[in-house]
């Protein structure tokens, strides 16, 4: 078994930035599970399906789905979906589909297969509690809503997306509500997770804190 690091937290808490840098610094692989959810959600929508579609239709579509995650890009059946999943709509769509047990079970199985026997940093919503419950280090990042709105807005602006502050706030509040209230794997820290509030911390401060934790766990 490789050394697995689970990074959980709400949208725009800093998971992706920290996970990528941590993986680079350690020479580990990196998996963004949120990207896999968004890609599958967009794929299902393209197939004319929605979260209210008949279960048998969703099951049939999911059986045909092969997900690959390479170098920060996500592929469905060999087709690159990375650019298609950048919008706020894709994030909300993913949260809607993630309420369905058959979607979560299918993706959790795929995510575990990707992580098997690897030194890997995995980011998402339920990594430490569901996907990798035996991960050697579990981190739960959090931040104030205001800080997360600012971060998400900058992220969209860097991608050239014209999104208003109000749209970002609505997106985050909607995703927070869905993440914390869903019956299946609601967003919460694992009992053995280290919770880090990143509101007033720089990226480097967060990174150094986690690197110190990694060093301690590797020595244990």
UniProtKB/Swiss-Prot annotation:
Keywords: ATP-binding, Cytoplasm, Kinase, Nucleotide-binding, Transferase. Coiled coil: none annotated. One of its GO terms (cellular component) is cytosol. ATP binds at residues 9-17. Its EC number is 2.7.4.25. One of its GO terms (biological process) is nucleobase-containing small molecule interconversion. It catalyses: CMP + ATP = CDP + ADP; dCMP + ATP = dCDP + ADP. One of its GO terms (molecular function) is ATP binding. InterPro entries: Cytidylate_kin (IPR003136), Cytidylate_kinase_dom (IPR011994), P-loop_NTPase (IPR027417). It is an enzyme of class 2 (transferase). It holds the Pfam family Cytidylate_kin. It is found in: Cytoplasm. Belongs to the cytidylate kinase family. Type 1 subfamily. This is Cytidylate kinase. It comes from Thermotoga neapolitana (strain ATCC 49049 / DSM 4359 / NBRC 107923 / NS-E). The gene is cmk.
């Amino acid at each position: 078994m490789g050394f697995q690091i689970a990074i959980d937290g709400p949208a725009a808490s800093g998971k992706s930035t920290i996970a990528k840098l941590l993986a680079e610094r350690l020479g580990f692989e990196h998996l963004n599970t949120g990207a896999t959810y968004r890609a599958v959600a967009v794929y299902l929508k393209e197939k004319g399906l929605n979260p209210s579609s008949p279960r048998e239709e969703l099951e049939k579509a999911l059986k045909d789905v092969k997900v690959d995650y390479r170098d920060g890009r996500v592929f469905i059946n060999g087709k690159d979906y990375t650019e298609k999943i950048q919008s706020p709509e894709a994030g909300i769509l993913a949260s809607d589909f993630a309420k369905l047990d058959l979607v979560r079970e299918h993706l959790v199985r795929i995510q575990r297969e990707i992580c098997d026997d690897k030194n890997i940093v995995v980011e998402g919503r339920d990594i430490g509690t569901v996907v990798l419950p035996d991960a050697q280090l579990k981190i739960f990042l959090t931040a104030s809503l205001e800080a997360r709105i600012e971060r998400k807005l900058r992220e969209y602006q860097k991608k050239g997306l014209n999104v208003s502050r109000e749209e970002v706030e609505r997106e985050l509040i909607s995703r927070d509500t869905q993440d914390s209230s869903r019956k299946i794997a609601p967003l919460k820290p694992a009992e053995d997770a280290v919770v880090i509030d990143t509101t007033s911390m720089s990226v480097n401060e967060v990174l150094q804190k986690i690197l110190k934790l990694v060093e301690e766990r590797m020595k244990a």
